[in-house]
């Protein structure tokens, strides 16, 4: 049986790239996240907006904020999210969030165990 690698997708709202751009900076601020970074890889990404309400639908569904009825409905009316794709591939999926904008009401329960 072939073992597959774990997949972690971590989004930290309002955390700037320049704060965690290298391992030493990350280790000083968030040592556990720094250890995860050392085991995998990171990408510098640029958000398409300044607001969580606009950005999260885009991150989850790879669509623009105003696509599929706008941003007020989260991902309810959007195409399949990346979470649903990895779930269909056999991965366990979990969401840990304190953000009220990532709730089931906005469709963010789609694809999570």
Ranges and model annotations:
Residues 4-6, 17-113:
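Active-site-proximal alpha/beta segments of enzymes that process anionic O-linked groups
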């Amino acid at each position: 049986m072939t073992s597959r690698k774990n997949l972690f997708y971590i989004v930290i709202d309002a955390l700037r790239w320049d704060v965690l751009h290298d391992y030493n900076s990350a280790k000083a601020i968030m040592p556990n996240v720094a250890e995860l970074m050392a085991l995998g890889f990171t990408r510098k990404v640029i958000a398409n907006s300044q607001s969580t309400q606009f950005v999260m639908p885009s991150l989850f569904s790879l669509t623009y904020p105003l696509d599929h009825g706008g941003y007020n409905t989260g991902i309810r009316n959007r195409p399949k999210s990346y979470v649903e794709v990895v779930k269909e591939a056999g991965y366990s999926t979990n969401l840990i969030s304190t953000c009220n904008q990532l709730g089931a009401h906005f469709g963010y329960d789609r694809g999570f165990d």
